[in-house]
Structure formats: structure tokens, C-alpha cells
A protein has these predicted regions:
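Residue-level signal for well-ordered alpha-helical segments
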Residues: 3-4, 36-43, 193, 197
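Short coil/linker segments at helix-helix boundaries
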Residues: 32-53, 99-111
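Residue-level signal for pocket-adjacent positions within structured domains
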Residues: 30, 42, 211, 215
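An aromatic- and glycine-enriched ligand-binding surface/loop that stacks and positions planar moieties
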Residues: 56, 64-65, 79, 83-223
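Proline-centered turn/helix-capping motifs that create local helix->coil transitions or kinks
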Residues: 26-35, 124
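Conserved, well-structured interaction surfaces
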Residues: 1-30, 44-57, 61-77, 205
């Protein structure tokens, strides 16, 4: 790829990261799967499955190599950038570590920690939580700094890109709960005194929505 322009190298790197993302979804769902790095030919129709460990190692390396040609924050909203690549490495390595792929949990957890530390050092949280969820707010520099990968919408609110995640009334096979958040998510929000629910005297197990961090009600729908 030595003869490619800088912009072309960026595009190739974005594609490599996206391919890694989709293979990550496959091995997370199915484990060992058929694995291609080039367009398959007709005689490869019944190709053997490749070990999920081999695929995971490959896609982690792909993302690491791709970071060389990506900006930390994409100039064009909705595009892959360096922080997304490292964030994906973190998520993929956590998968391998948590499920002890190939008996290499320690190695994968180390990779995950290193990738996460790079993103944490470069990206900051938005100053106003509400801005994350409104069009006007999403255009602000501090909000863009928090959003690692955006899903772009038209001004009328319709999605101009393919929806990456399921959104509906029921749980999906990829583990998304859609409009049904888990209790684990709800319990992560502190009380208004800044303490966790297992520490705060303000927490009421019978009325868990009371005295909670304002982001609790901004995130979760309640009756």
C-alpha cells in the first residue's frame, strides 16, 4: 500500500476496523466461524471454520495497524477514527479475557487495559449530559469529543446510515435489551449524594427511582 495517498490509507484503515467489528460480532455470537481476508472463490463454499482465538488475534492486530492512519477524532462525523479502533480493541480483548479464549485471559485483559487507557487519555466527557441526545448538542465540540462513533441522522430525524443495533420492544439475539434496560445498568447510577446505591442512605429499594443521579431519569423510561 506504499503507493496509496494519505486519504486512501485512511479509507483502507476504516474498512479494516469495520471488518474487525463484524468478525467480533460473529465470534461473540457463534465462536469458531468461516474466516476470509480476501473475496472467497467458488471452491471455498464449504471452507472449514477458523478458531475464534485465531480470528480474535487477527482482528486485534488489524485494528492496531489501522490506527496509524486514523485521526484521534474523525473530521467527518460518523466515520471511524483512532479512538473507535482502540475502543474496539478494548471490547474485543475483554471478550477474549472474560471467556478465557485459548487460555490467554491474562494476555487479553492486558491488551484491553492498554487500549482503554489510550482512549481515556484522549477523550473527555461532555459538559452537559442532555447534549448527547439532541441534534443541537451533538454538534458541540465537547459532545463530539465524548461520542466515539456517531450514527448520523438527517434534520428530519431519519437515519441516513444502516442501523447497527436492534431497536424494538423485545430482546435481540446479540444481547441487546433494546427498550428494556437491565437492572445492572440501572444500579450503576449513584444517588444524589454521589454514593453508590449500596452505600447511600438515600437509596430506597421500594422506590429505586427516587434520589438518583439526574442521568438516571434522563436515560431510563419509567412508569
Amino acid at each position: 500500500m506504499d503507493d496509496l495517498s494519505k486519504k486512501s490509507l485512511q479509507y483502507v484503515s476504516e474498512v479494516r476496523v469495520l471488518r474487525a467489528y463484524y468478525y467480533y460480532l460473529l465470534i461473540a455470537l457463534w465462536g469458531d466461524v468461516p474466516f476470509y481476508t480476501e473475496p472467497p472463490t467458488s471452491d471455498q463454499y464449504e471452507v472449514e471454520k477458523t478458531s475464534r482465538v485465531k480470528i480474535l488475534d487477527f482482528i486485534i492486530n488489524e485494528c492496531n495497524e489501522a490506527t496509524e492512519y486514523l485521526d484521534w477524532i474523525a473530521m467527518d462525523r460518523g466515520r471511524v477514527d483512532k479512538s473507535f479502533a482502540y475502543g474496539l480493541i478494548n471490547r474485543m480483548a475483554l471478550l477474549g479475557g472474560s471467556l478465557d479464549f485459548g487460555g490467554k485471559s491474562t494476555e487479553y485483559f492486558k491488551i484491553a487495559a492498554e487500549a482503554a487507557s489510550k482512549v481515556i487519555g484522549k477523550r473527555l466527557l461532555a459538559l452537559n449530559y442532555e447534549d448527547l441526545f439532541v441534534v443541537e448538542g451533538q454538534a458541540k465540540a465537547d459532545v463530539r469529543n465524548e461520542m466515539i462513533l456517531e450514527m448520523i441522522y438527517n434534520v428530519d430525524g431519519t437515519n441516513v446510515h444502516r442501523n447497527w443495533t436492534g431497536f424494538g420492544f423485545v430482546s435481540r439475539m446479540q444481547g441487546q435489551t433494546s427498550r428494556h434496560p437491565s437492572m445492572l445498568l440501572a444500579d450503576t447510577y449513584e444517588c444524589i449524594d454521589g454514593k453508590r446505591i449500596d452505600e447511600s442512605p438515600l437509596y430506597d429499594v421500594h422506590h429505586p427511582q427516587k434520589n438518583r443521579d439526574p442521568r438516571f431519569k434522563a436515560t431510563l423510561w419509567m412508569h
